[in-house]
């Protein structure tokens, strides 16, 4: 499988990245290890995880996904060296008081979270360490517009960048990235890095699919001009673009049992549960069938053949 370079970093990854947020919740450890084995066998060299996983986030499963991956590394000698490993430090609480008591994201918080991830992952370095979401108020997770009235006290970006730089200098992190960011955030991280000689962000991990084009609204130009690669998550629109909800809807009696969008109430209410999302997905899914494709093939092709996308998390 071909590889692409992430931003200006030395990381070269496959255009497919294995997402792991269900490991430890919907997917048990044995099945998770089987998925990791299969992914590596098929040539995927990129894994993404986060300290807050598994999803939906619960106190008992905090760190479960990283622990499962770490156990797999321990059972598969040499596997770690074949992979680009990405993880994320959680931002301030989104209903998760068990993470730093729901407080902000200081330099000390970033360092402590990284140390925890390294222990759970049973590795001495994380190739790409990302801020999962900003400490400041941003239009993300279903929020469409910025509202300055919702701003609260926050750690300066420069201070967060210095903490990440310390982790890079210590050899615990190779490169850094962002997630659920805005054009302002990406530009500010790059500007401060260049101004102060600090590590430059290589990536931004944001939602991107046929029914979520928020990235196209100026963030694509920002990342293109600053050479920051997009890691596209939710390329299947939380399952809406697979076609499995076309007939049943997402909350009806015919909804597939155990389906995430039906089970994860917060995600359904915040993002994918809007009627217009399913309506748009149904139209794309029908278009795929009319052209001899499965809905999933069309949805993934949209990302795989899009100049905006570096790697697609699936």
Per-segment meaning from a language model:
Residues 1-88, 108, 124, 169, ...:
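N-terminal binding-site loop/beta-alpha segment at the start of enzyme catalytic domains
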Residues 6, 18, 32, 47, ...:
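Conserved, mostly hydrophobic/aromatic
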Residues 7-26, 86-101, 130, 134-144:
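N-terminal small/glycine-rich loop or linker at the start of catalytic domains
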Residues 20-30, 96-111, 147-155:
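Active-site mouth loops of central-metabolism enzymes
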Residues 21, 52-55, 115, 131-134, ...:
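Flexible loop residues that form catalytic
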Residues 27-39, 106-120, 157, 161-162, ...:
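Short, acidic/polar
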Residues 95-130, 207:
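Active-site gating/metal-coordination segments in enzymes
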Residues 134-314:
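Beta/alpha (TIM)-barrel catalytic core signal, keyed to glycine-rich beta->alpha loops juxtaposed to Asp/Glu
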């Amino acid at each position: 499988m071909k590889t692409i370079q992430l931003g200006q970093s030395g990381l070269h990854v496959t255009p497919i990245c294995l997402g792991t947020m269900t490991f430890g919740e919907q997917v048990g450890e044995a099945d998770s290890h089987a998925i990791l084995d299969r992914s590596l066998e098929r040539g995927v060299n990129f894994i993404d995880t986060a300290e807050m996983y598994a999803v939906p986030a619960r106190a008992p499963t905090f760190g479960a996904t990283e622990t499962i991956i770490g156990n797999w590394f321990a059972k598969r000698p040499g596997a770690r060296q074949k992979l680009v490993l990405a993880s994320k430090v959680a931002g301030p609480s989104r209903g998760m008081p068990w993470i730093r008591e729901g407080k902000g994201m200081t330099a000390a918080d970033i360092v402590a979270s990284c140390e925890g991830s390294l222990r759970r992952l049973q590795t001495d370095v994380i190739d790409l360490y990302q801020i999962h979401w900003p400490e400041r108020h941003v239009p993300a997770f279903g929020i469409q517009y910025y509202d300055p009235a919702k701003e609260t006290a926050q750690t300066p970006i420069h201070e967060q960048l210095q903490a990440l730089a310390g982790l890079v200098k210590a050899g615990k992190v190779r490169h850094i990235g962002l997630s659920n960011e805005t054009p302002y955030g990406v530009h500010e991280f790059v500007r401060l890095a260049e101004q102060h000689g600090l590590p430059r962000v290589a990536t931004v991990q944001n939602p991107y699919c046929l029914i979520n084009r928020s990235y196209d609204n100026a963030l694509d130009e920002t990342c293109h001009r600053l050479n920051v690669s997009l890691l596209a998550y939710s390329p299947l629109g939380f399952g809406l673009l697979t076609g499995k909800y076309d007939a049943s809807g997402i909350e009806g009696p015919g909804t597939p049992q155990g389906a995430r969008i039906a089970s994860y109430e917060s995600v359904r209410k915040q993002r994918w549960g809007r009627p217009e999302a399913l309506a748009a997905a149904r139209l794309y899914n029908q278009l795929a069938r009319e052209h001899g494709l499965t809905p999933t093939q069309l949805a993934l092709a949209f990302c795989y053949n899009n100049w905006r996308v570096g790697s697609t998390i699936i």
